[in-house]
Amino acid sequence: MSSSPLSKKRRVSGPDPKPGSNCSPAQSALSEVSSVPTNGMAKNGSEADIDESLYSRQLYVLGHEAMKMLQTSSVLVSGLRGLGVEIAKNIILGGVKAVTLHDQGTTQWADLSSQFYLREEDIGKNRAEVSQPRLAELNSYVPVTAYTGPLVEDFLSSFQVVVLTNSPLEAQLRVGEFCHSRGIKLVVADTRGLFGQLFCDFGEEMVLTDSNGEQPLSAMVSMVTKDNPGVVTCLDEARHGFETGDFVSFSEVQGMIQLNGCQPMEIKVLGPYTFSICDTSNFSDYIRGGIVSQVKVPKKISFKSLPASLVEPDFVMTDFAKYSRPAQLHIGFQALHQFCALHNQPPRPRNEEDATELVGLAQAVNARSPPSVKQNSLDEDLIRKLAYVAAGDLAPINAFIGGLAAQEVMKACSGKFMPIMQWLYFDALECLPEDKEALTEEKCLPRQNRYDGQVAVFGSDFQEKLSKQKYFLVGAGAIGCELLKNFAMIGLGCGEGGEVVVTDMDTIEKSNLNRQFLFRPWDVTKLKSDTAAAAVRQMNPYIQVTSHQNRVGPDTERIYDDDFFQNLDGVANALDNIDARMYMDRRCVYYRKPLLESGTLGTKGNVQVVIPFLTESYSSSQDPPEKSIPICTLKNFPNAIEHTLQWARDEFEGLFKQPAENVNQYLTDSKFVERTLRLAGTQPLEVLEAVQRSLVLQRPQTWGDCVTWACHHWHTQYCNNIRQLLHNFPPDQLTSSGAPFWSGPKRCPHPLTFDVNNTLHLDYVMAAANLFAQTYGLTGSQDRAAVASLLQSVQVPEFTPKSGVKIHVSDQELQSANASVDDSRLEELKATLPSPDKLPGFKMYPIDFEKDDDSNFHMDFIVAASNLRAENYDISPADRHKSKLIAGKIIPAIATTTAAVVGLVCLELYKVVQGHQQLDSYKNGFLNLALPFFGFSEPLAAPRHQYYNQEWTLWDRFEVQGLQPNGEEMTLKQFLDYFKTEHKLEITMLSQGVSMLYSFFMPAAKLKERLDQPMTEIVSRVSKRKLGRHVRALVLELCCNDESGEDVEVPYVRYTIR
């Protein structure tokens, strides 16, 4: 995949949007010429520079306005241990104006447990000074400086946001009071072993521009009553999705025109398709039509200062199963600060004397607390556990709390998303051994090595076990990079016999650098897996990491074979598609290995843990399929920009990829035509017509021919086809029931007139002509003036709409029409195609769509094609940025979510390595940092099935030895008899993959032939594939009857052949 040069920037956005509007002009208005970049295409202009090629995926989360506000905010991060460096990393990647690192302490052994930018040779050096150059590499747009002096008021005054980590309560209160009085936003973050704490104070009056980050909803109106209040009814194609308290605006309403362009109005939801608005009793009568759109209205929120909030706290829940815990930990953390002040150190790990003292201090804090904080009964067991682990420093806890804290910093800078109001407490006590007696003070003593912060919590035996683990990490993108960092910090596979194997076939692109933090600008075009492996060796030189570049799937099962999987202790997925996830899930179920699964989408993230014989698998539950756009909507009746963008993507494939591929196959494969004629419906006609067009009717000889073709195609799509559609269905057409045909979701189009001086029209011709030329190996041009001159001489044929042209109104109509094919037309086409031997050496060059290269004309074509069609149908156009999101199917992403999610994954990893056996020890997690929302649940148990008295789950199977003691392989008859005698099951159908090996309705002759054949021979014959030497066993699926003839569900068969 190609990528843009690192220095290239786009100027984006424009003047401030209207108050109450959620979209910038760049989102709502068509891109126009202000500067012409290297490929001659027009772009938007603006005052603020945002490097879109770097921040692309994050911009889809935050938006341009929030991003500009980030770029004007200077942030102080105080405390550069594991938590501080995590927060600093995330906000530097995020692109704030500048970051100052503050720490007066020096590197200790325990810091290396989670501070990934400190090394053994740094012990004794200042943490901020050592970390500064390594953090500065993350983003060349963000100056990073180190400061080792005291936090005096003059110094603090120069920042918009101050972050305190691992700081004493006394310092927090002093800084908090000062920041609140000066309008400086404050985030306080702390981690203590398996516990985390977060506090936010963003001032007396903060303007929140968007509380949830979701795209504003819109719906089509079918009725508005004249009433007080008026009731709006939406078309029943889909629920409106609004909530009471939302604000909406109206457009395109016919009749009740007072609604169009009115100020945003608050609504009350009455049902899934109805809601009430203002008093409409004096408005005109509603006739038809209209679009109602949600409007994000800014609102003001207020925060208490840290001293005030300490005695009157508000909590955000992280786990509803621990409802009373935040209030208890609010007391516990205050007591812990007192203990540290008294002893100049936290309680010693697992030390009973220190734990008892902390409980006493907590009781005293509770006793003098005001009623709003005071607990009726202090959870002494919880406080004792806090004492046991408070000296610990765990990378996964720091990743989770650090991801959250960094997102809060971004909220403070931008006013985007709802902040944490105001305290958050988190714990992961389920990570402790299920055997309560397993840990002793002796086992948790510091060893003066890099894992001391972790040994303090889990003991030295567990550290040894971690070092010997063998793990397979699939993917080295954003989640993969974070997982590798955490693996290195916790010591996974870092000892003798341990190993982490990471595979990823992708190379690094510039847009990756914003969140895949192991990569640097100079790594662009290098392999991800190799680069990531080299980077984590810098973090922990002891990690045994091996990098591969293989795609996981049936094609690589000779590499990731039985031996490979049987040697593993577990698998972690870091994938970006469902198919690969489900494949790895099947492999883990087959080899009975734990699987750690996770994913992110913008500020949303999820974690799932799959444990053999205990939980369901990843594939046990699936999301409902995405709703596809009906073909007729795309072809004739679009009503949303998503429709025109999908149409443009289909155009790209149908013009610049599929015809070239078909031509090349026609020229090189003698059976191509024969194969094509066997395709269903009208496909043979469409394919052969495209080949004829490419080789005969439209084959260009010069660049001028390509410009002519592009101009003609423009007229076909944006003028002639629309005129034909309006000929079939005039604007005043009525349906059989007397209703207007062009109403509801059907928008009446109008044809466009080509104008060489219209930037968008020229954009289209430039992009289409260059891409068309590329498919023929001709040289294109980026000279807009020269192309405009060529267009003056292009003769456009006259078009007259024809009668008798069938235009399908529904997909059902289209499908029934597709059933009939004109055979005489097919014969005519075959006769007119030139013989391949008359075109020696000729080939075409199919183009694969690549969204991230701004110089290749791909997105230029998509934007122009989509926006011209949008103009046909009076649909609001989309700028390049939004078009790329939708047409490129980009997954919005931000470093903060990835860090937090991977922190949760690695907490589950602690449990997996220890071998936790209780289902309620594990936690599947879901979070949305924008809301903020956190939800945890124990994984679902594997569903249980039964035949006879035998219970089984997806983890069970029949083990059948194919090779008999005499060295001969089992025949099909022996296999069927084996199940009858051993399991009292009569097999009615038997399959391997998609190959049917046996069925009760099989023809007698075929059955007789197969019964005496060895099983592997039947598999090879039916599948027409030879079994590879790496295949030691086959997976066979059965349909069975029990002795009473009833159909019973049974496990699969693992049939061993070597």
UniProtKB/Swiss-Prot annotation:
Q: Which residues carry this modification: N-acetylserine?
A: S2
Q: What is its main location?
A: cytoplasm
For this protein, what post-translational modification is recorded in UniProt? ISGylated.
**Record's catalysed reaction(s):** ATP + ubiquitin + [E1 ubiquitin-activating enzyme]-L-cysteine = AMP + diphosphate + S-ubiquitinyl-[E1 ubiquitin-activating enzyme]-L-cysteine
User: In the UniProt entry for this protein, what further remark is given in the free-text comments?
Assistant: There are two active sites within the E1 molecule, allowing it to accommodate two ubiquitin moieties at a time, with a new ubiquitin forming an adenylate intermediate as the previous one is transferred to the thiol site.
The cross-references to NCBIfam families, in alphabetical order and at most eight, read: Ube1 (TIGR01408)
Q: What is this protein called?
A: Ubiquitin-like modifier-activating enzyme 1
Q: What is the lineage of its organism?
A: Eukaryota, Metazoa, Chordata, Craniata, Vertebrata
